[in-house]
Amino acid sequence: MNGQINISRFIAKLDSCFDRNDMKAAKECIEYWEKEARETGDDRALLTVLNEAVGFYRRTQKRGKALAAMGESLTLVDKLGLPDKLSGATIYINAATTLSFFGKEEEGLQLYDKAARCYEIERHTETYEYAALLNNKAGTLNALKRYDEAERDWVQAGDKILKEIGGHAGEIAISLVMLAHLTFDRDTTSYEKVEKILDEAWEYINSDDQTKDGNYAYVLRKCAPSFDYFKRHDEAEAMREVAKEIYNKR
């Protein structure tokens, strides 16, 4: 059976699940729409659903399911003729992040580089999406102790792209928190420099242009453990409380 499904409806429903932090509903949503996409033969819709599944299973630490969905999504990129397109880059970034998360950093770097080439071909390098690529790639480089390259990418993402285009205070905060880890990993005596970076991250976390939505709650939950790690427990607890309040209201 060939047809098309309403993929924007799927995204809206899945976003609603994540805004409530309802992982059970998110899983059911993904499974339902994956089945619909397969039954209708809508490969483009299936690619979107599988890409969301990759992120979901990574988030819930389901290694086998994440890698299986990732493998099929990469096959669909080729089948649909998207290897040099921005839509293909999105799949590569998600796959690379997943490989890195599950300890396959070198394989992940190869896909980050493929994604970067897509952005370069499309002249799309001064964008939020490209900054997100650099942020994720920097995390992988840091895990491999390639500190100079990681710092280069985090600085480019935060200082040279996100600050320039504006409106992404949460993502800048995440970049700074990761930069604090890099600084400490490279030199465990660099307390003063780490504190300065975290102070700047805290300012961005509390920026007036932050919309107090599910994405903001995600930023808070992502940053809180790092503040705990660096013994800034009061700020970490404050972030967790605000995130909890946001999720409870939705």
Protein language model annotation of sequence segments:
Residues M1-N51, F56-K62, R250:
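Flexible inter-repeat linkers and adjacent short helices
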Residues I11-N21, A45-R59, L86-F101, Y128-A143, ...:
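Conserved alpha-helical positions within TPR/SEL1-like repeat arrays
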Residues M23, D43, R63, M70, ...:
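TPR-repeat structural position
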Residues E31-E36, L74-K79, D113-I121, V155-K163, ...:
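Amphipathic alpha-helical segments of tetratricopeptide repeats
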Residues E39-D42, K79-P83, I121-T125, K163-H168, ...:
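Short coil/turn linkers that connect adjacent helices within long alpha-helical scaffolds
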Residues G81, A96, R123, I165, ...:
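Short coil/turn linking the two alpha-helices of tandem helical-hairpin repeats
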Residues V155, D199-E203, F227-K249:
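TPR/TPR-like (Sel1-like) alpha-helical repeat modules
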